[in-house]
Amino acid sequence: MDLPSQLIVPGVAESPERQAKFVSTTDFLADAAAGRLPQFSFVEPQYSYESQENPQDIQVGERFIARIARAVMQSPNWGRTALFITYDEHGGYYDHIPPPPPSRPTTRRRC
């Protein structure tokens, strides 16, 4: 089992009130379905399994993101919800095909 990352945040490990604000992914999914999400949620994968970091299978991480996104989008609160997916790592997987060159900038100005 992964070490919950909230335990590395100063003051959380010693505070039962703060620890109570952290829930499992299962609870998050249930809260989303019931329209009980708080004003702000920060969702993390199990880093030893569900992340997209090397050497994990990135498809598992993609499924995790899809499951979270689907739950939020099907929530009764979706109409007034913003969903941001961010990364703190760039991956580490090599793409054997170089990206295409950038488009040539236009010399005309558009108004």
Regions found by a protein language model. Give the residues of each.
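N-terminal pro-sequences and low-complexity stem/linker regions of secreted or lumenal proteins
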Residues: 1-111
